[in-house]
């Protein structure tokens, strides 16, 4: 079991607390340090506008080893009308990642939100099946060999662990999951295929138990699910990240990962707990924080990220670097 240096000691903790912002250690890369501990990446989300912001881009290039498109690969961005695809934003991110030697996590293929009305209005099983297959195949074949992993289905569970009510579950039942994963495997056999959801930060949650139960069943039925991604919560309160990741790994998937990580207040202790959890679970391949700077966060008022609104490294960033 690997553990980072604890922050419980009074001297170190007082030192961190004494400064609101500690200047970034120029020689350090949080990705390189994490990979040195046997992981694949420490990543962030981005898109064209953020990558064209010189301050943001410099940090992405120097510190992070993986990129997840924040919005440019969602259904409404890629296929706003049936059969009409718009790849400009997604191409920009994929090209940037290739040029700068970054892994890419494709996000996301099937999701109930940011879904065009033309998809939401489908009521026929055969029609929806073909729409899902065409959407996944077109996108994945375009980026075949460029995407390390895809979030194939996203946020499909309710808090009680049952399937969320969506056009996909209404029309196809749970079979939409099989359809999506089998289509994705055929489109790019080498990409890792993930199921992604939030509020999986405790093994005791009904949602976590539901995820574990369904994934075990789908794997037993031959559905090609490679991994589970946990969207850890945007708050600062007694996380139980390690036991939760262990529970997800127990399903039999080959990989688990943490994504969309932003913690309200960005305390060093909470960020270190998540990092330690991933280090302690051998199948956890990486962590993705949901943005670079608080300025650009969708939750900017809660200051949840590793860099402040002036693009300066915060205590949590430096604590991770120091500990790794």
Swiss-Prot record:
Disulfide linkage: 278-284
Endpoints of the signal sequence: 1-19
Reactions listed under catalytic activity: Endohydrolysis of (1->4)-beta-D-xylosidic linkages in xylans
Entry keywords, A to Z: Carbohydrate metabolism, Disulfide bond, Glycosidase, Hydrolase, Polysaccharide degradation, Secreted, Signal, Xylan degradation
Induction: Expressed in presence of xylan and repressed by glucose.
Family statement: Belongs to the glycosyl hydrolase 10 (cellulase F) family.
Role: Endo-1,4-beta-xylanase involved in the hydrolysis of xylan, a major structural heterogeneous polysaccharide found in plant biomass representing the second most abundant polysaccharide in the biosphere, after cellulose.
Annotated protein name in UniProt: Probable endo-1,4-beta-xylanase F3
